[in-house]
């Protein structure tokens, strides 16, 4: 799991692979060097990006405003910054 996480000055950057239009929102293990996340929303007009941020914020117990999309706006492969948390906190909550 360490491959998909990196510590920065602001928090932790998480690499994810998003599978939209799934039957439910869930973590689905690792895919390569990314955490795979299945989401119910379609990849239309940023709906999957929004749900991805909300889902991770809920899992990590942080405000939605502290989860920011860094890259991958139009891609299934995304990098998200979770502000104000440590690598160990994210690792413990997502495992």
Swiss-Prot record:
SMART domains according to UniProt: DUF167 (SM01152)
Classification via InterPro entries: DUF167, YggU-like_sf
Top-rank taxon: Bacteria
Gene Ontology CC annotations of this record: cytoplasm
Pfam families in UniProt: DUF167
Family per record: Belongs to the UPF0235 family.
HAMAP family: UPF0235 (MF_00634)
The protein's name: UPF0235 protein Pcar_0617
